[in-house]
């Protein structure tokens, strides 16, 4: 296939013995043809495109030797090296446009440029023989930035102070100059690199070559290429122009002419043979490059490689890309020959006998790598060439240490070759030879040979990051075919010039910062902060030397951003001049006046972070502040940094600080007048150090761009130093302090710094206004908008009829309903929103009268009002947690305190909605939040401990005390001065003096500190001082008028006063709150009229006959008939149902049968013992179809046709099985129901009409068959035919009826047709009404006129529905109803049910209201309709209405003596506690006449707790006064309180005194399971249970140990006091004591507790037991 001889004697395409090409060209004996038929000079088989092969061993596609190139061009053995695109060829070449050029044998650059050419050609073939570079079309052009950079000056306009001004601008980009406007910055940079203008002092002696062919003369010694190789002689430019260097600086030493990329002419020509681009060398590479011998693309032998690199002639082996190897040679990827074979990743090869490529077919079995190099037997390397043996080889980067692993960039290495085949003793990626450690890519030495990646010739010893110079002593191979001749170039060795200020070692960077700064100052490419060097590792991560070099390279072309030159000032509109702000960051920084002179100054201490963690977590001590300003110059950081000055100068901004000005209006008194200054700085919101200073209006009007500090930075540093070292301000307690702390005003430097980082002034925005109504802030909005208000101006005022809404995004809004008139109002200045706060009319002087303008009732919505956790300082936004905390209730309390009306709180958005009557300030203060869900007052008491002031303070400490709050003066009630008397020593005062700090937890109620709102405060406290026997009351918010002098307070370290001593005996008493509904009467009442006339206005006489109505069970009411006569009247409510009792029971049995009961669990709404259980909740399963059928059967059995109709309608509207097409089927069933009901609603005479009107009457009843018969009878065959056809195919007949109507209309005969007949045609044509014009009059006919809603809806369902469902027909019917053409279905139960089925959002309450019968107390139909709708899934009825329905129906059943079913109905109540209360109340009412069997049935059938039934019976048994029965019922009801009372007071004492041990044992057995639940059981009832146990133990002869335990327990309980015990209990205890006495006496173990027994009992004991030997006892009586 590819030209090889086959084993079967023929080629792949049927050729003879000679090889043929891929497309079947015949190959002669001594002539082979390439892909396009060109003859090749050598005989033998051919390669992929016809290349001949001489040796059996070949590459993957057949290695060729001495044959043609990839396209069959013959190649002659030469010593020249061709370039990538065909440079350096002996034969005549043609350019892309056919121009020929001659080339001498020489090596070429990357794109075919010959080195040392005297004549080159342009892209179109024109010859350029002059030393100067050629342009695109051969013309001589100026390349590079030879002209000095001068920024073009132009003009522009901008808005300043509301006016348009013209300013001058400079385009700080070199490509904006007219001389470079046709090139980009990258093109200019490449041209400068080609011309070796990369840094000052390159030393060129002639003009540099441009990008497209400009020639360069020979560089002087010391110049270097891009990657560090110096250029010794002339080279060609990028596209063929002669120059001293290749595009990337590689040196060559020959002087031959080669062609450029697009066919630049070369000097020499030879036999015709074409390359890819038209070059015809004798033998060429892929792109026409000449080589010594022909080679295929993948089978290169001694010719050129894929890119034309020349190799020594070999006989065996070839790599994937045509590299062939001799015994001791191997080629690289691009054909470069190395001394030893190398793998792609640096594996060294031994000298194989025969080599083949990695993909050869039939090659020798020698091991080779993927590119044809044989693998070494004992060597191996890592990805970058690290080997474990000492064999020679090269890595991808040319580094191969003898014994090392990992990445080796330039370490000392043995002889290696680089990634592209160049042989060197050891080098980096670009072929630099290194004999000693070097830079990143390898410092070179003089001993090895090697080339850079792009043909760089290595220089001598020193080497930098990219700028190492080497001196070649042997021929070099470039990466892409440049062959350096073996000649010695004498070069002057000079000091290496760094590319961008970087020398041979990266570690020397810090020593060369002077050079870097000079380059930054003189960089010609403007200012770009994106290219600044970043030294912050937190932002850019780990910076590599490569990235550092790239940044420095770009930075060399940029102007210093922090320069204070005029250019930087002129360009301040691009970058705000933040350098002045950043220059004053830290007080520890001492710098010169010119900040830009020390670019890399590094502060060794971090500036103070006052931003509450907003800065980075760590601070890099090596990070320059100026560099940090570039990367961290966000608005937040600028605010933080500029706030440092504010805190140093003692200034604060009260505008943007939460809780500063906002708290000035609070009713809040801090009775601790003195607070430490450090605590003030930490806690006081007024002196928040993080805040920016207030910016005045004049400063805001200044342009942000041109604002500069008004004070020299050096002076500002000195001023701050003095401010820090000054003494604290004196505290003058004799003058009333301001509402804010008396701090110094904002300094000029601080104001300027703040203005620099502030947002642009408001005047730069074009403010839109309507009649003076405007919004100047972008985050405020209004509804309607300002533009819409322009259309609402009347008489010079904006009149809003539908109200006004003003809001701020993410803060809230205020809505004023009704008519609002505005004029000349800045809405965002009157309505001010802050976090959780709104103020309308912040200036009290500008406030409108109440009820006018915006000082009127409104609805306020504050956003993001969530609870803030005190520990984590995070907002709690979880709805469940907010509910648990009670946040909504807290907001309700705060709303009441503010005098507003709470409306809503939406936890999802934190929206707090309330209504106010007038405006001042409303909101929620930070300290108004509850602590962990506790009420605010409790949180205050828990979080506000007593503040203790130590008396052992110095005068300096007293001076540091700052008064925090304005305190109102007060006068002593007895006008006595508080005298401070001196005492000898402070020890007389004791240790500490507590002073109560009380904070009134009141919300922002908009009130002032007056007495009118005093009653709204919670926990008002008064402080009482006892002075000289008089009591003086100091009201809250006030202070004694005579305040102590400062001198006396300063001497507290040595002495104190009696006033301070009295503080130890401080009495804090709660102030009595006035009653909420106290009657405030006037003076003493006086009799104004006579006694006789006073009877006329006597209220008692007016209501003399009124009496309280008492409701009894079963709905019976009782009232008195006085004063007319002494009678008690009874009345009953008619609760009879429309159905009989059997029907009631049968219907309820259906519900009981299909219902499901489920216990919801214990009630969480009550903790009482009686409410611990709940009744079962009744619900219904989804299988409700059986309910419909049974309801219909019960109604039919009772003869209630109306109920049957309702149940059938519900069954048709809500089918249980909904198969495909169920909607249409439902329409059919509803149509059938409508037919039945329509017949019932029409009189019999109309339905039996046989006249011509009878057709229409039958159509209105839905009977089309009968209408057809009547039409036949009345001689209307056409109508009859069409009616009959419509029953079969309604769609077709619709068009026929319409056509008939159109025909009559055209003939103007519509008015002559009978009305009923015309209605038939209109209806059957699919219309419910029809209109037409005739003789200038409008005529219309309405088919629904005169019909009830059932017939009207039936016409839509029967004839106008087509194949749609019920919803479409109902919608069409509703349109006719709304248009007044049809009767409405509202108010009728079937109509409401149909509406509910078609409109699911319809109210269920409205449907049930229509189910009420004639008797308003009959809820039978309503409740059962509800049960059906509930089972279907309509559960949108409000719980209140639902509960009321259940209670009413239950009362009806109770009045009918159906108590069991009444309980069942009550179990449908959804609320647990309400359901339990209703059921228990009903049980109490029916317990009187209900026997135990009925209760057992109720408990079993409806799962009523037995405890509830027993409790109901217990209430009834109280009237019987049977303690035994009561005790049994109390135990059954688990009424623990009653169990304990009955057992202790009656049951147990009676059994003990009577000696009825069996009854006592039975009672104790009943109580024993509940002993742990009965309160106070151990001190009361356990005496009797222990006594019962003692009797059992004695009777059973138990062990003595058990008896002793019971005796000790019993004796202990007998010592309980007997004050509250009745006589029976005392007697029982004496009886128990007597038994214990007898037992102890028998055991001879009487204790001294016998004193407990009475005298008589003891005498009785002694009398009865005289044989015990009384003489042994000495009994003392008290």
Curated annotation (Swiss-Prot):
Top-rank taxon, per record: Eukaryota
Signal peptide: none
Biased composition (Gly residues): 12-22
UniProt KW Protease keyword: yes
GO cellular component: cytoplasm; kinetochore; nuclear envelope; nuclear membrane; nuclear pore; nuclear pore cytoplasmic filaments; P granule
Composition skew (Low complexity), residue ranges: 1-11, 23-38, 73-83, 345-366
GO MF: nuclear localization sequence binding; RNA binding; serine-type peptidase activity; structural constituent of nuclear pore
Protein family: Belongs to the nucleoporin GLFG family.
Name of protein: Nuclear pore complex protein Nup98-Nup96
Organism from which the protein derives: Caenorhabditis elegans
């Amino acid at each position: 296939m590819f030209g090889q001889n086959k084993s079967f004697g023929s080629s792949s395409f049927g050729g003879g013995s000679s090889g043929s090409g891929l497309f079947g060209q015949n190959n002669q004996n001594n002539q082979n043809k390439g892909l396009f038929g060109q003859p090749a000079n050598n005989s033998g088989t051919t390669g992929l495109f016809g290349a001949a092969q001489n040796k059996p061993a070949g590459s993957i596609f057949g290695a060729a030797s001495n044959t043609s190139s990839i396209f069959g061009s013959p190649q002659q053995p030469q010593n020249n090296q061709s370039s990538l695109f065909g440079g350096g060829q002996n034969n005549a070449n043609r350019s892309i446009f056919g121009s020929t050029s001659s080339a001498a044998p020489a090596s070429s650059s990357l794109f075919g440029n010959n080195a040392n050419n005297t004549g080159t050609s342009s892209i179109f073939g024109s010859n350029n023989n002059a030393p100067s570079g050629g342009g695109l079309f051969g013309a001589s052009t100026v390349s590079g930035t030879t002209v000095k950079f001068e920024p073009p000056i132009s003009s522009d306009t901008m808005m300043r102070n509301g006016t348009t001004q013209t300013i001058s601008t400079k385009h700080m980009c070199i490509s904006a100059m007219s001389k470079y406007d046709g090139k980009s910055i990258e093109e200019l940079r490449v041209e400068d690199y080609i011309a070796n203008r990369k840094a000052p002092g390159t030393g060129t002696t002639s003009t540099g070559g441009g990008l497209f062919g400009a020639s360069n003369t020979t560089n002087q010694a010391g110049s270097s290429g891009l990657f560090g190789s110096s250029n010794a002689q002339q080279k060609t430019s990028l596209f063929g122009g002669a120059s001293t260097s290749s595009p990337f600086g590689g040196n060559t030493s020959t002087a031959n002419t080669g062609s450029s990329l697009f066919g630049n002419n070369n000097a020499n020509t030879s036999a015709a043979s074409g390359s890819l681009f038209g070059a015809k060398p004798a033998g060429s590479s892929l792109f026409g490059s000449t080589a010594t011998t022909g080679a295929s693309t993948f089978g290169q032998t001694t010719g050129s490689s894929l890119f034309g690199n020349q190799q020594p002639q070999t006989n065996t082996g070839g790599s994937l890309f045509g590299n062939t190897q001799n015994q001791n040679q191997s080629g690289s990827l691009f054909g470069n020959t190395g001394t030893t074979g190398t793998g792609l990743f640096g594996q060294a090869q031994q000298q194989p006998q025969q080599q083949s490529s990695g993909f050869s077919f039939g090659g020798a079995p020698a091991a080779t790598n993927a590119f044809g190099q044989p693998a070494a037997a004992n060597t191996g390397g890592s990805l970058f060439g690290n080997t474990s043996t000492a064999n020679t080889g090269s890595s991808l980067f040319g580094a191969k240490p003898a014994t090392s692993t990992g990445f080796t960039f330039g370490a000392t290495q043995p002889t290696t070759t680089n990634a592209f085949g160049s042989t060197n003793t050891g080098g980096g990626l670009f072929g630099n030879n290194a004999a000693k450690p070097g830079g990143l890519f390898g410092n070179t030495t003089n001993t090895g040979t090697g080339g850079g990646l792009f043909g760089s010739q290595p220089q001598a010893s020193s080497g930098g990051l990219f700028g190492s110079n080497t001196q070649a002593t042997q021929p070099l191979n470039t990466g892409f075919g440049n062959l350096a001749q073996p000649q010695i170039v004498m070069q002057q060795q000079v000091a290496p010039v760094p590319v961008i200020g970087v020398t041979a070692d990266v570690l020397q960077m810090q020593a060369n910062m002077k050079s870097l700064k000079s380059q930054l100052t003189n960089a010609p490419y403007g200012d770009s902060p994106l290219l600044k060097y970043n030294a912050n590792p937190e932002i850019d991560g780990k910076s590599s030397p490569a990235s550092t070099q790239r940044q420095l390279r770009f930075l060399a072309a940029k102007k210093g951003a922090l320069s204070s030159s005029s250019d930087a000032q002129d360009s301040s509109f691009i970058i705000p001049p933040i350098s002045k702000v950043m220059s004053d960051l830290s007080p520890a920084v001492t710098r010169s006046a010119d900040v830009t002179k020390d670019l890399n100054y590094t502060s060794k201490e971090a500036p103070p972070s006052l931003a509450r963690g907003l800065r980075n977590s760590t601070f890099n001590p090596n990070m320059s502040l100026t560099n940090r300003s570039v990367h961290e110059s966000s608005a937040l950081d600028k605010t933080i940094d500029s706030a440092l000055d504010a805190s140093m100068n003692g200034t604060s901004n009260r505008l943007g600080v939460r809780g500063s000005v906002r708290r000035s209006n609070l009713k809040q008194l801090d009775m601790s007048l003195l607070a430490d200054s450090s605590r003030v700085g930490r806690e006081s919101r007024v002196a928040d150090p993080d805040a920016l200073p207030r910016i005045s209006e004049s400063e805001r009007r200044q342009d942000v761009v041109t604002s500069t500090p008004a004070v020299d930075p050096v002076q500002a540093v000195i001023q701050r130093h003095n401010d820090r070292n000054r003494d604290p301000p004196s505290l003058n307690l004799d003058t009333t302090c301001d509402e804010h702390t008396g701090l110094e005003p904002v300094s000029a430097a601080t104001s300027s710094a703040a203005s620099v980082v502030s947002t642009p002034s408001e005047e730069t925005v074009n403010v839109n206004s309507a009649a003076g109504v405007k919004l100047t802030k972008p985050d405020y909005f209004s509804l309607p908008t300002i533009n819409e208000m322009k259309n609402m101006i009347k008489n010079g005022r904006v009149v809003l009829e539908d109200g006004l809404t003003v809001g701020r995004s993410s803060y809230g809004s205020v809505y004023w309903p009704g008519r609002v008139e505005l004029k000349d109002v800045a809405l965002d200045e009157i309505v001010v929103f802050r976090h959780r706060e709104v103020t309308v009319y912040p200036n009290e002087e500008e406030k409108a009268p109440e009820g006018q303008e915006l000082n009127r009732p409104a609805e306020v919505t504050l956003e993001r009002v969530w609870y803030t956790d005190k520990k984590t300082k995070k907002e709690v936004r979880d709805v469940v947690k907010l509910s648990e905390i009670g946040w909504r209730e807290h907001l309700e309390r705060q709303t009441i305190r503010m005098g507003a009306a709470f409306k809503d709180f939406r936890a999802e958005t934190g929206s707090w909605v309330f209504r106010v009557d007038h405006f001042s300030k409303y909101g929620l203060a930070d300290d108004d939040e509850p602590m962990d869900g506790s009420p605010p007052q409790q949180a205050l008491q828990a979080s506000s401990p007593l503040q203790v002031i130590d008396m052992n303070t110095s005068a300096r400490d007293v001076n540091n005390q700052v008064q925090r709050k304005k305190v109102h003066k007060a006068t002593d009630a007895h006008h006595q001065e508080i005298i401070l008397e001196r005492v000898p020593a402070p020890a007389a005062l004791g240790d500490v003096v507590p002073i109560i700090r009380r904070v009134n937890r009141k919300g922002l109620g908009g009130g002032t500190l007056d007495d009118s709102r005093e009653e709204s405060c919670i926990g008002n406290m008064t402080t009482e001082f006892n002075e000289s026997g008089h009591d003086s009351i100091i009201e809250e918010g006030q202070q004694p008028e005579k305040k102590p002098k400062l001198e006396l307070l300063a001497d507290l370290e040595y002495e104190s006063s009696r006033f301070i001593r009295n503080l130890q005996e401080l009495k804090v008493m709660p102030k009595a709150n006035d009653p909420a509904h106290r009657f405030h009467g006037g003076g003493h009442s006086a009799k104004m009229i006579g006694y006789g006339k006073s009877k006329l206005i006597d209220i008692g006489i007016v209501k003399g006959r009124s009496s309280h109505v008492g409701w009894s069970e079963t709905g019976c009411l009782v009232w008195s008939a006085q004063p007319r006569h002494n009678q008690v009247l009874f009345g009953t409510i008619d609760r009879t149902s429309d159905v009989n009792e059997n029907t009631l029971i049968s219907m309820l049995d259906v519900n009981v049968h299909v219902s499901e009961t489920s216990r919801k669990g214990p009630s969480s709404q009550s903790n009482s013992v009686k409410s611990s259980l709940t009744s079962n909740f009744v619900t219904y399963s989804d299988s409700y179809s059986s309910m419909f059928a049974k309801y219909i059967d019960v109604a039919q059995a009772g003869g209630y046709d109306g109920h049957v109709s309702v149940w059938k309608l519900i069954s048709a509207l809500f089918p249980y099985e909904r198969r495909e097409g169920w909607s249409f089927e439902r329409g059919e069933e509803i149509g059938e129901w409508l037919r039945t009901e329509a017949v019932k609603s029409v009189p019999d005479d109309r339905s039996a009409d046989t006249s011509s009107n009878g057709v229409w009457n039958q159509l209105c009843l839905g009977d089309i068959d009968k209408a057809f018969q009547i039409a036949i009878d009345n001689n209307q065959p056409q109508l009859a035919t069409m009616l009959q056809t419509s029953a079969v195919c309604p769609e077709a007949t619709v068009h026929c009826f319409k056509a008939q109507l159109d025909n009559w209309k055209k003939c103007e005969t519509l008015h002559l047709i009978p009305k009923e007949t015309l209605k038939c045609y209109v209806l059957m044509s699919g219309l419910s009404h029809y209109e037409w014009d005739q003789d200038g009059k409008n005529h219309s006919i309405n088919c629904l006129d005169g019909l009830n809603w059932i017939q009207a809806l039936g016409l839509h369902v029967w004839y106008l529905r087509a194949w749609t469902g019920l919803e479409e027909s109902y919608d069409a019917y509703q349109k006719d109803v709304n248009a007044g053409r049809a009767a409405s279905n509202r108010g009728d139960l079937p109509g409401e049910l149909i509406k509910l089925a078609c409109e699911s959002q319809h109210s269920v309450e409205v449907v049930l209201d229509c189910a009420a019968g004639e008797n308003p107390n009959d809820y039978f139909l309503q409740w059962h309709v509800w049960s059906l709708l509930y089972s279907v899934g309509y559960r949108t009825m409000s719980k209140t209405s639902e509960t009321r329905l259940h209670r009413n129906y239950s009362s009806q059943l109770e009045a009918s003596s159906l108590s069991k079913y009444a309980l069942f109905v009550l179990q449908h109540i959804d609320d647990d506690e309400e359901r339990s209360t209703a059921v228990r109340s009903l049980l109490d009412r029916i317990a009187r006449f209900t026997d135990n069997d009925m209760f057992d049935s109720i408990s079993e059938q409806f799962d009523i707790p037995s405890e509830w039934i027993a409790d109901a019976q217990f209430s009834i048994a109280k009237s019987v006064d049977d303690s035994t029965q009561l005790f049994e019922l109390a135990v059954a009801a688990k009424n623990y309180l009653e169990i304990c009372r009955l057992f202790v007071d009656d049951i147990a004492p009676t059994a003990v005194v009577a000696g009825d041990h069996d009854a006592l044992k039975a009672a104790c057995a009943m109580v024993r399971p509940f002993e742990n639940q009965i309160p106070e059981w151990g001190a009361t009832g356990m005496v009797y249970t222990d006594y019962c146990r003692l009797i059992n133990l004695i009777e059973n002869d138990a062990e003595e140990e058990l008896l002793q335990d019971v005796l000790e327990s019993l004796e202990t309980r007998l010592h309980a006091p007997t004050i509250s015990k009745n006589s029976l209990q005392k007697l029982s205890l004496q009886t128990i004591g007597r038994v214990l006495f007898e037992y102890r006496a028998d055991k001879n173990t009487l204790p001294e507790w016998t004193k407990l027994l009475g005298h008589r009992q003891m005498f009785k004991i002694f009398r009865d037991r005289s044989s015990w030997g009384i003489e042994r006892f000495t009994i003392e009586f008290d």
